[in-house]
């Protein structure tokens, strides 16, 4: 019975820590650039694109496809940075818990 109570207490503590981590992640931002800084994006912790900067030299009709590719590349880089930061925070939170490798938490 004591073990069950201890597990319940640990679960509540973990739940509170996860909520705090989710709140912290929501306030994070990640910026990434492509094309040597010609395109820069900023993503919120939830992955929403919050800012986009484009160098005016790319505003040419014959360079639309290049611009599109640079925006996608910058966005993907920013998303990868956010995912890495979230994984690091999650790993520190769940250290010592028997979670299978590759298991993704629901946030």
From Swiss-Prot:
Subcellular localization, as worded in the UniProt entry: Cytoplasm, Nucleoid
Keywords annotated in UniProt: Cytoplasm, DNA-binding
A GO molecular function held by the record: DNA binding
Segment forming the signal sequence: none
Main location: cytoplasm
Domain of life: Bacteria
Sequence similarity: Belongs to the YbaB/EbfC family.
Quaternary structure annotation from Swiss-Prot or TrEMBL: Homodimer.
HAMAP family for this protein: DNA_YbaB_EbfC (MF_00274)
Biological role stated in the UniProt entry: Binds to DNA and alters its conformation. May be involved in regulation of gene expression, nucleoid organization and DNA protection.
Protein name in UniProt: Nucleoid-associated protein BMEA_A0033
Source species: Brucella melitensis biotype 2 (strain ATCC 23457)
Lineage: Bacteria, Pseudomonadati, Pseudomonadota, Alphaproteobacteria, Hyphomicrobiales
């Amino acid at each position: 019975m004591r073990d069950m109570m201890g597990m319940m207490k640990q679960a509540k503590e973990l739940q509170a820590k996860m909520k705090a981590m989710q709140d912290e992640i929501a306030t994070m931002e990640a910026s990434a650039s492509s094309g040597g800084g010609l395109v820069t994006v900023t993503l919120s912790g939830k992955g929403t694109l919050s800012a986009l900067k484009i160098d005016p030299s790319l505003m040419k009709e014959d360079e639309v496809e290049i611009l599109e590719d640079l925006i996608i590349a910058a966005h993907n880089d920013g998303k990868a940075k956010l995912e890495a930061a979230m994984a690091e925070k999650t790993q520190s939170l769940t250290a010592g818990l028997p979670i299978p490798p590759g298991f993704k938490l629901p946030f």
